[in-house]
């Protein structure tokens, strides 16, 4: 044991290795081990490398130029390098991974690793990639573009907390067998582009936190996804703070039970079409749109009231229009300001009035933020084009009144005033702030006859 305690470097050449090497090079056996090199060996008989290099002292691992005279027996690489937090150099070009079924946690916690070349990996038999690269915080480059993921069922947390990863090409991945995408890209805070437009997610049931914290991602194309099997979408896009466009209009949400925090913190999102969402199975919508500070309108045509909707609209400070199903009976967190029914011009002075009013509706209703104002225009003996002597305009605070000019026989029009004494002339160039009555001022026309 004292001899093993002093070994820093292990080199294995021209040897035949067989059986399981699970946990073989860990710090429990080699407490000061810094490097391992396996070269020109026969690895056909190796069955497991699970946790083989999971050690905090290891800095370099080279496995290259090896032979496989017979079909490889290697089935598991689970946690092979997990928490090898000093590992900076890695060459796995001599591994035949064609029979491997699990790569779960394989590189998780490799917090010093900056580059990883896996372009030669045969992943055709792999079913589990859970947390495969999780918390490899310095990883900037990684080529996984040729991964055969046709057998993979679990991609949960696969790239979680890869905070330095700027590029990731998964555009050609076959995800038809995947059922779990919980946190697949969560907190990839440096990822600027991500093409998942061709993902087949028809078998996926779990999408919790899938893109949460992808804070520099500006675009994400999920428009053609078949989400009919998904049951959980909570926190799915939370804190995607740079996301300006997101088309979820075709999402089939009929099986979804939770949408809590789904879009929370998407502070750059100006438009979001969820009008086709079927929320009949949803029980939790808490914080669903929380702090979507740029969102101007929401169409919730098919929404129903869930059991939990705490602060669903909190922080939607730019929201000025809300079209709501009559089955959605509460608006938790909505700005406590004036709203009005755009169809019936009913003024609702605060949140409580809005909610009470909407609970009495039997059809979807559109509400606009603002105070409903009226401007009564008294022609004072004159008349408008339609022969009316009085005209009423309806506007909302912030809009502009129309300047309408009446006529009166024998007089010319001298403007609109806020008082009958004609001392306070009305300024149509200013936005509407209060309701008012205006009075037309007339000046009699005189005919002056000058004798010849």
Annotated model-derived regions:
Residues 16-24, 48, 52, 76, ...:
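Small-residue (G/S/T/A) turn/hinge positions that recur once per unit in extracellular repeat modules
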Residues 14-28, 405, 433:
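Extracellular beta-strand-rich solenoid/capping regions of secreted or surface-exposed proteins
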């Amino acid at each position: 044991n004292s001899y093993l305690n002093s070994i820093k470097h292990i080199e294995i050449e021209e040897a035949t290795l067989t059986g399981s090497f699970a946990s073989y090079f860990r710090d429990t056996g080699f407490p000061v081990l810094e490097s391992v090199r396996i070269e020109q060996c026969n690895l056909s008989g190796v069955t497991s490398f699970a946790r083989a290099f999971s050690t905090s002292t290891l800095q370099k691992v080279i496995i290259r130029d090896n032979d496989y005279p017979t079909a490889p027996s290697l089935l598991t690489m689970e946690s092979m390098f997990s928490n090898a937090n000093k590992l900076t150099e890695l060459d796995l070009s001599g591994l035949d991974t064609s029979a491997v079924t699990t790569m779960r946690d394989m590189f998780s916690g490799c917090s010093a690793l900056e580059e990883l070349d896996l372009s030669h990996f045969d992943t055709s038999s792999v079913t589990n990639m859970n947390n495969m690269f999780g918390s490899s915080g310095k990883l900037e480059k990684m080529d996984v573009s040729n991964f055969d993921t046709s057998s993979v069922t679990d991609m949960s947390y696969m790239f979680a907390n890869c905070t330095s990863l700027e590029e990731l090409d998964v555009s050609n991945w076959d995800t038809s067998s995947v059922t779990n995408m919980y946190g697949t890209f969560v907190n990839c805070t440096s990822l600027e582009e991500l093409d998942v437009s061709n993902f087949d997610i028809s078998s996926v049931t779990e999408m919790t936190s899938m893109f949460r914290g992808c804070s520099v991602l500006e675009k994400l194309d999920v428009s053609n996804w078949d989400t009919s099997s998904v049951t959980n979408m909570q926190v799915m896009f939370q804190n995607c703070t740079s996301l300006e466009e997101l088309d979820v209009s075709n999402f089939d949400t009929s099986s979804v039970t939770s949408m809590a925090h789904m879009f929370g913190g998407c502070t750059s999102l100006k438009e979001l079409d969820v009008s086709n969402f079927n929320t009949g199975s949803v029980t939790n919508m808490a914080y669903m749109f929380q702090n979507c500070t740029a969102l101007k309108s929401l169409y919730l045509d098919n929404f129903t009231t869930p059991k939990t909707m705490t602060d669903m609209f909190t922080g939607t400070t730019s929201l000025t229009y809300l079209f709501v199903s009559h089955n959605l009976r509460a608006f938790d967190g909505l700005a406590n300001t004036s709203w009005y029914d755009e169809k019936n011009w009913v003024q609702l002075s605060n949140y409580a009035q809005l909610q009470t009013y909407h609970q009495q509706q039997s059809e979807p209703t559109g509400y606009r933020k603002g105070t409903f104002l009226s401007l009564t225009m008294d022609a004072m003996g004159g008349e408008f084009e339609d022969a009316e002597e009085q005209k009423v305009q309806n506007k909302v605070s912030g809009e502009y009144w129309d300047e309408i000019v009446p006529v009166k026989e024998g007089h010319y029009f001298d403007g609109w005033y806020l008082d009958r004494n004609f001392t306070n002339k009305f300024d149509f160039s200013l936005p509407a702030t209060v309701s008012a009555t205006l009075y037309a001022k007339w000046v009699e026309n005189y005919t002056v006859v000058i004798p010849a």
